[in-house]
Amino acid sequence: GIALTVDGAEFRTYARQVLDQASLLEERYKNAKPRKQLCSVSTQHYMFAVEAFVEMIESTKSDEYEFTIRETRTKDIINQVANMLSEIGIIYLSDFNKDVIGKLLREKHLEFHPLFRAPLHVFISRDNPLAGKKKVTMDDLKPFPFIQYEQGEEGSFFFAEEAVWPEYSPKQINVTDRATILNF
C-alpha cells in the first residue's frame, strides 16, 4: 500500500481546510440575499445630529437594518470611530480646541470634515425672561445656572461641547445626557 509522509499528511490537512472554507464561501454567496444595512454614529449631544439620524432611518428602503446612535463624550466619540464601533463621529471644532482635537484625530488616523458653521446660541424656555430678547449677553446669563456636559475624568476644556464659558458661574450643573437639560 501507499503511506503519506509527514509532509504529505500535513498538506492533506491544510487542503481539506481550504476546501471546507471554499465550500462555506460558495454556500454563503451562492444564493445571497441583500445583507442587512448597518450604520453607527457617535455624536456629541446635538439635536441636529439626532434629527439627521432619524431622517436617514426614515429614508432607508432596506427591509433589514440595524442603526445605532450614541450620544456621548468627545473623547469617546473619537475612540469609537477609531475602533470602528461607529462609522461617523460628530464633534464640535473651534479655534480654541482645534489644535488639541486635531492632534488626537491625527494620532488615531482620522479625518475631520466640517458639516457647517453655527452661530453661538442659547437654549432657553419660552417662559424664561430672556426669551423675548433678540440678543443675549454673558451678563444676561449670570443669574441662570450654567449647564455643561460632563467629559469624564480625562476631559478637559478642549473636549467641552460648550462654545463659551462664563468667567464665573455660581450655579453650575453638569449633565451626561441631553434629556436632563429639558427639566431645567
Predicted regions and their residues:
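Basic, amphipathic "hinge/linker" alpha-helix immediately C-terminal to the N-terminal HTH DNA-binding motif
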Residues: 1-21
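Hydrophobic residues within well-ordered alpha-helices
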Residues: 5-8, 81-82, 141, 183-184
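N-terminal winged-helix
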Residues: 16-20, 24-27, 32-80
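Flexible hinge/capping segments at coil-to-helix
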Residues: 33, 104-120, 124-146
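Short, well-ordered beta-strand segments
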Residues: 38-44, 89, 123, 147
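Secondary-structure junction motif
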Residues: 49-55, 98, 130, 134, ...
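Short beta-strand-centered segments that line the small-molecule binding cleft or hinge
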Residues: 54-59, 75-120, 124
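Hydrophobic hinge/microswitch elements
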Residues: 73, 82-87, 92, 151-184
